[in-house]
Design a protein with these regions (language model features):
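Short, charged beta->alpha transition segments
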Residues: 62-64, 93-104, 211-212
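Long, highly charged, low-complexity intrinsically disordered interaction regions
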Residues: 269-341, 377-430, 436-437
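Flexible, acidic/Gly-rich N-terminal and inter-domain linker regions that tether
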Residues: 1-69, 374, 382, 390-437
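Conserved AdoMet/S-adenosylmethionine-binding subsite of the radical SAM
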Residues: 96, 119-302
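Canonical Radical SAM [4Fe-4S] cluster-binding loop centered on the CxxxCxxC motif
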Residues: 64-93
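Conserved, mostly hydrophobic/aromatic
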Residues: 61, 74, 113, 170, ...
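Short Fe-S-cluster ligation motifs
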Residues: 100-114, 288
């Protein structure tokens, strides 16, 4: 494993932006518009990814690895020390130059910087710190920065870097310690959770400092996140959602990201995926994650040991409602906010608008449509002044059949990929024709 010498900055960018594509910073915006040689701008230039802010804005980030060299041999990673891939590494100044040039051209609004482990965790973390320090001080870059903290690095280095970054993340990698031991024996769960706890404590302490001293430097002001690979190991959806719930409760994470496993190494320890990455499963986990964070659901309400996986035909909220018809129909003009949140087709913004609007007048279905309620899902579960929108049966089979006819239950890009739910661990199947990207 050798880093190629004397390669251009553009070649490094090509190699290290491609190497970063499986590091999940965000949900994809789905934008694939390239430059036409006449107009200005290019939404798919090397390294540019798209994320969404809390208020729904699409934000472009320069997403790169500092280096794809790595001393570890994780079975699932395309950059592991035994992979036959082109190796490259930036210098701190090169990352600064790229970030500033992309920013000046209005290609990006921030930087997402991760890295393989070069030489040692401390050595790599020091390089990331130097990069952020130069960006903030020498280049006066005030844009958004999301940086990966390196497990096993000196806590002081992670702390210093946290005062320069907006968001910091430490990847959980795999859902359980047993899975991590099997596929990444060079890593340990404790090594990952320890810096996660340190960042959590640092954020809490810093909030108290900022409350006392308004101009105190801010430590990871956008919070911390993590990522789990889904489908490489035998954990079910119930285990994964329960782990995410614990992470939110015990580590105050802002976000847990889920990455559908893509078999890029063809390691014998990894499952065969003849149907491609489990994209629908990833989608259902994100929907459930949203319910945990914004809709006050608990993991035990969505799934159970007896029913450990999500319905592939219905989203988790619709599935929960159909299994709990005893709570429905809900009277829109009287139900409290928490109950409104549990109605399919009513989002947290719509629920707030309903509560505010009904203070002034009685609401009907026309009002709900204007408010933003998705009536094609909600109509089975609500009444307005004691009346349902249509004469519908409050029966599980009837509602289920009608909701399953709603094509929005499965996103278009997943439907068109020919996705179907398969056994995740039939390793006897041929691995030819796997989807690699």
């Amino acid at each position: 494993m050798k880093i190629q010498q004397n390669i251009s900055l553009m070649e490094k960018l090509t190699i290290l932006s491609d190497a970063a594509k499986y590091d999940v910073a965000c949900t994809s915006s789905g934008v694939d518009r390239g430059g036409d040689g006449i107009g200005l701008g290019n939404s798919i230039s090397c390294g540019i990814c798209h994320t969404f802010s809390a208020d729904g804005r699409c934000v472009s980030l320069l997403k790169i690895l500092f280096t794809n060299e790595c001393i570890f041999n994780c079975s699932y990673c395309q950059n592991n020390c035994n992979s036959d891939v082109r190796r490259a590494a930036f210098t701190p100044e090169e990352v600064c130059e790229l970030t500033m040039e992309f920013y000046r051209r209005n290609y990006i609004e921030g930087l997402f910087l991760s890295s393989g482990i070069m030489v040692s965790p401390n050595y790599t973390m020091e390089l990331l710190y130097q990069t952020l320090y130069k960006l903030r001080t020498a280049h006066h870059f005030n844009g958004y920065i999301h940086v990966k903290a390196i497990p096993g690095a000196d806590p002081l280095l992670i702390e210093k870097t946290g005062f320069l970054a907006d968001r910091m993340s430490i990847n959980l990698e795999l859902p359980t310690a047993d899975s991590l031991k099997k596929l990444a024996p060079c890593k340990s769960r404790n090594t990952i959770l320890k810096p996660m706890r340190m960042v959590q404590n640092g954020i809490t302490e810093n909030k108290n400092e900022v409350a006392l001293y308004r101009h105190a430097p801010k430590f990871v002001p956008a919070g911390q996140s993590t990522q789990m690979i889904i489908g490489a190991t035998p954990e079910n959806d119930y285990q994964i959602v329960s782990i995410a719930e614990n992470l939110y409760q015990k580590f105050d994470l802002k976000r847990v990201f889920y990455s559908a496993f893509v078999n890029v190494t063809h390691n014998s320890n990894l499952p065969a995926l003849p149907g491609g990455p489990p994209l629908l499963r990833e989608h259902r986990l994100y929907q459930a994650d949203w319910l945990l964070r914004y809709y006050k659901f608990k993991a035990d309400e969505l799934l159970s040991p007896e029913r450990p996986d999500f319905n592939i035909f219905l989203d988790p909220k619709c599935d929960w409602a159909i299994r709990h018809l005893e709570y429905f129909p809900v009277e829109i003009n009287r139900a409290d906010y928490d109950m409104l949140l549990r109605v399919p087709g009513i989002g947290y913004k719509s629920a707030s608008r309903i509560v505010k609007a009904r203070r002034h007048s009685t609401l009907d279905f026309a009002n709900l449509k204007k408010i933003g309620v998705v009536l094609k899902r909600a109509l089975y579960f609500i009444t307005c002044s004691g009346r349902m929108m249509y004469r519908t049966k409050l029966e599980e089979d009837y509602i289920c059949r009608n909701l399953m006819g709603d094509k929005t239950q499965i996103p278009r890009e997943i439907r068109e990929s020919g996705y179907k739910q398969l056994s995740l661990f039939d390793t006897q199947l041929s691995t030819e024709g796997l989807l690699l990207s």
